[in-house]
Amino acid sequence: PVVAVPNWFSLAAISVGLSILILALLFRDSAGLSSGGRGFLAFVAYAIATFVVWLLYDFTLEYMTPVMLAVGVALCVAALGVILVLLAEAHEWAEALWLKQSRRPTLPRTLPDHLLPKVSVHVPAYNEPPEMLMQTLDALAGLDYPDYEVLVIDNNTRDPAVWQPVQAHCERLGARFRFFHVAPLSGFKAGALNYVLRETDPAAEVVAVIDSDYLVEPNWLRDLVPFFDDPKMAVVQAPQDYRDGDENLFKAMCQAEYRGFFRIGMVTRNERNAIIQHGIMTMVRRRVLDEVDGWPEWCITEDAELGLSIFERGYTATYIPHSYGQ
């Protein structure tokens, strides 16, 4: 049955007022949104405001005991957290779908070969299948770039049958590839990266890092290194991608979750020079990497911590939402 709400006008007015406050918060950083994006945010704001007002109104009609009141307040605090997350997600969706023009450059740039700096590509590995790692190195050997080196470091792998085939493969690939097996070596992945940083050619101006199971596209360096033409640019980041997402439903769902981060969250962060650096498909200016004393070995998320240290020193970073490998 339809039940009359005697103070419906006041509730509606409160809903409108709350919606305006939410919209003011959402529109503070939405200058680049099209009308579709603003309309989407308005719908979200009014829906959330209506839900909140009705929930609180219905709650006040209940007979309250001290326990019920305490539980109700706790649930309201939890609901506030959920609402804040929903608002942040809505803003990210709006920017991903309805942004009229990006504030940051995201298209590949070109420079003539004589202006491209030398790049040192670092590949850390621990107890990795040699056949897989050799495929990674073969892909690096096919890079379309005039001046680069590849440093492979295997740290703490005990079985020589695992790392020696990779060492031999590096020798076959030529002088551009250098292999290091170090045991014992502390510092985990960061320790391995710092080791090869000390072995890097002094002429290298950019350090790039990939994982041992990643097959890069030939144009990776040629497309992204030119962004370092900006002297304030310290980090150039490409997304992670995966080549087994179509094998089954579970892997497809995992890949969809990753894509939400790399195609939405990282894009909106890039608009504000606030990307999260990750230690694969990343490039760092060598001078800046030395300035922050290399990769932080004390931190399990050495990649994100490195990015924060670089931002703290006033440098910029950019994210290119194009897959350059899997």
Regions found by a protein language model. Give the residues of each.
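Cell-envelope/extracellular polymer assembly enzymes that use nucleotide-activated donors
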Residues: 117-120, 149, 305
